[in-house]
Amino acid sequence: MSEPDKAPAAGALQGAVPKLEIQDLFISYVDRAGKVVQAVEGVNLTVANKPGVGELAVLLGPSGCGKSTILKAICGLLQPDSGTILIDGQPVSGTGRDRGMVFQSYTSFAWRTVRKNVEYGLELQGVPAAQRQKQALEFLDQVGLKDFADAHPKQLSGGMKQRVAIARTLVNKPRMVLMDEPFGALDPQTRWGMQSLILDVLRKQDNTVLFVTHDISEAVFLADSIFVLSHRPAKVLHRIEVPYFEDRNVALKQSQAFKQIENHLLDMLQSLEVRGNVRVGL
């Protein structure tokens, strides 16, 4: 495990163009009182491009520290004050189909069926109806919802709604998937199931994922690498490599290797005096 104070090249494979590279990112906004608030300050991080296996990186930090702000900038939903965001070496200048985002809140269209929700992005791209239906059903099958293709969102549980959101994102085959605390509103049992589902589905798709959470256990269970952020304004304080890559299941959370990394993060966060704002785990 490594923990540099600044991570300008952390996670890059030697000689390869990183999937994501952020250089000296600064983001501010004006609050309701008219005061300028610095949300992100000099963030540098790199997520490797690992063809054939994918990569899952986690932004871990206290609530309100700027994690979601960074994600929105990568997605192109907001413009940074300064700095550079590169996807596969190309600068981000706005939204695009190369990035897909899954939010914590449920974002399905209530009047469309589950299948029609998943088809929505393909419909905007002008994909023929028969092909849209085929692809949507394939991804619904992957997330275990093929039998609910003709249901409406109001008939689904919270976990099922998030599965719809995941299928709707992946069917567009983005180069990078951005996930903003997608399981934060779920009960513990559903949350565990969704964590396992994410690992299974995303590995099959060879996706690069940037996942935001303030749950330490979730971060260690999901991540190949973890970027620890400070209080607002967000800075990258440490980067942790998670040394195991296979057989990630609920039993792993009781293993010595898992507990060692979890405790290491707890000690780190305690030393930064942010533990009170970070969830220890479920």
Regions found by a protein language model. Name each.
Residues 36, 95, 115, 149-152:
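Signature (C-motif/LSGGQ) region and adjacent switch/coupling loops
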Residues 75:
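Helix-to-loop junction immediately C-terminal to a conserved catalytic motif
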Residues 83-94:
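Conserved ABC transporter NBD signature motif
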Residues 112-120:
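Short coil-to-helix segment of the ABC ATPase nucleotide-binding domain corresponding to the Q-loop/switch region
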Residues 119, 123, 130-148, 200:
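Conserved ABC ATPase "signature" region
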Residues 151-154, 172:
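Conserved signature/switch motifs of ABC ATPase nucleotide-binding domains
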Residues 166:
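Hydrophobic anchor residue at the start of the ABC signature
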Residues 177-180:
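Catalytic Walker B motif of ABC-type/P-loop ATPase nucleotide-binding domains
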